[in-house]
């Protein structure tokens, strides 16, 4: 891969793995952070804020590929992508790779709607583009379960299924795509198995050595129907290999 790659969201769960893998491939990596960071890790750290636009023009200057792993909440997410696209266009960026989520076009929750709007901005940017959708990371599911375990009862969305994937596997695919040309919508990346939410919650509680009453909760309306219909899943793209049990073992050891 020739030229510099800018990674946004470089300190996040996915972004830091992408940065690490690109550096290991010998790629010149520029990483965007809202706070100043020291180098020494083979990375050129730059300060910028996608929401305000501060520092973004400088961040994209001289860059061939932008990998957007950043996430903000709601409308700010869309505004951030618009800012990135505008500055990347001015700088002559060759390829913009945007990481999204499986089901953003099927599950009508606000966060997913914002992601879908971001995809549209990328598609209409005039830049060469790739969008990669992935299912939920093990890390996200663990954070949700950590929060649920602090409640008197553990809520379980009735009928919901999850296809969690290892973030390292998604990062590896992102790093590959960054070295290729614009691909439009790339094949999705899903975890190895589609599993009931309840089954994953039970596995978490066993691994954590916790006891909680699991409380079935019916998710109402169109969101509930979309989840029960598997709108958040991509069973035909179950290409991940790392299991949720392996993530639990890494987190809790032999507990």
Task: Describe the function of each predicted region.
Residues 130, 143-165, 169:
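A conserved pocket-lining segment of Rossmann-fold NAD(P)-dependent short-chain dehydrogenase/reductase
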Residues 8, 32, 69-70, 96-101, ...:
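SDR active-site strand-loop-helix element
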Residues 31-37, 49-51:
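N-terminal Rossmann-fold cofactor-binding loop
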Residues 100, 117-140:
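Conserved beta-loop-beta element that borders a ligand/cofactor-binding pocket
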Residues 2-27, 33:
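N-terminal Rossmann NAD(P)H-binding glycine-rich loop of SDR-like oxidoreductase domains
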Residues 8, 74, 78, 108-116, ...:
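Short-chain dehydrogenase/reductase
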